């Protein structure tokens, strides 16, 4: 068994009890129906399954595709049953998805699996009363990487061509938790046990020193696919992250460059580290999850801006709301304002000659 597999499996096993006890009303939790192990791709039925969570009785459901983490080599939807219930209790139809793990399934095959999962959900929309105009994605760690690459698959034909499959639906919003958004940076970082190099080897079948020769290197950098069409996104991250340090900051810079509407929460303590919101308790976890609830509620209500448009003060100390104006918008707004009206009146009076 590989070191990287041991590490990421241990994280799930050790944290399982805590991560799967979200703060839920007991009656709501009992009302949630779970349909497990639905196969969405018969060609890889050993791994391509999802669990569906919902509370019966709604006419239409917002839809969430949740993608677990695990360093690309480990993880399972069963370890994300808590967060799936947490979202389902909000009236959302949640699809908690498994996908092919490396090295059995080399990248980008797992990404193609996830596009197929999206398409299965699209095909089930009528039967399950899903509102695909309120379809969003979320994931933690490697799951956040895949979530951001699904957005790239929605927005770029060349990504679809690489995968051999195109999404049938558009992603309307995203919640990204402590993700990886630039593998090129990660392979050059120094990490304990060389965990990044080991994961890259499982992910691609190559050594990290050979990254430039990797056939699919263009699909390893989600930040490269940020553009004006990127959906509103909540980015949650830890400034002391031992696995994905500096990754969210790079994504946010890309958002700023393209005027993407985003909100973010950053923990600043070492204790609130990688994927801290899944721990539920503690100042940072509670604040991040409160912001997530607010963000998702506004998304469902249709109250999130499609693009960044203006600067507002932060709602609380942990949340950074980015709504920047473009230079063009600034010029337009200035053009509409009267410039020094009193001075203009004085100049007009001086040039006015008395009639004879």
PLM-predicted stretches and their roles:
Residues 1-347:
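Alpha/beta-hydrolase superfamily serine-hydrolase fold, recognizing
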């Amino acid at each position: 068994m590989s070191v990287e597999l041991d590490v990421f499996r241990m994280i799930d096993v050790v944290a399982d009890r805590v991560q799967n006890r979200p703060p839920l009303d007991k009656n709501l939790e009992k009302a949630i129906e779970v349909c497990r192990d639905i196969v969405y791709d018969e060609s890889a039925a050993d791994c391509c399954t999802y669990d569906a969570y919902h509370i019966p009785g709604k006419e239409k459901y917002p839809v969430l595709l949740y993608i677990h983490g695990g360093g690309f080599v480990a993880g399972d939807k069963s370890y994300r049953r808590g967060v799936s219930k947490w979202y389902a209790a909000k009236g959302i139809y949640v699809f908690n998805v498994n996908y092919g793990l490396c090295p059995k399934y080399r990248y980008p095959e797992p990404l193609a699996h996830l596009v197929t999962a999206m398409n299965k959900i699209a095909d089930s929309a009528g039967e399950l009363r899903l509102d695909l105009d309120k379809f969003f994605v979320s994931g933690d760690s490697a799951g956040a990487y895949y979530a951001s690459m699904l957005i790239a698959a929605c927005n770029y034909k060349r990504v679809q061509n690489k995968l051999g499959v195109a999404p049938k639906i558009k992603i309307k919003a995203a919640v990204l938790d402590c993700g990886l958004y630039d593998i090129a940076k990660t392979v050059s970082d120094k990490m304990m046990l060389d965990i990044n190099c080991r994961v890259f080897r499982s992910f691609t079948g190559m050594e990290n020193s050979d990254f430039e020769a990797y056939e699919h290197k263009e699909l390893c950098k989600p930040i490269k696919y940020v553009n004006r069409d990127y959906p509103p996104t909540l980015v949650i991250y830890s400034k002391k992250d031992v696995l994905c340090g500096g990754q969210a900051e790079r994504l946010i810079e890309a958002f700023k460059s393209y005027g993407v509407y985003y909100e973010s929460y950053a923990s600043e303590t070492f204790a609130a580290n990688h994927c801290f919101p899944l721990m539920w308790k503690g100042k940072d976890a509670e604040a991040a999850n409160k912001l997530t609830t607010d963000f998702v509620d506004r998304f469902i209500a249709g109250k999130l801006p499609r693009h960044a448009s203006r600067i507002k003060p932060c709602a609380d100390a942990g949340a950074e709301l980015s709504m920047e104006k473009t230079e063009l918008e600034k010029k337009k707004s200035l053009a509409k304002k009267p410039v020094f009206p009193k001075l203009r009146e004085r100049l007009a009076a001086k040039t006015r000659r008395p009639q004879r």
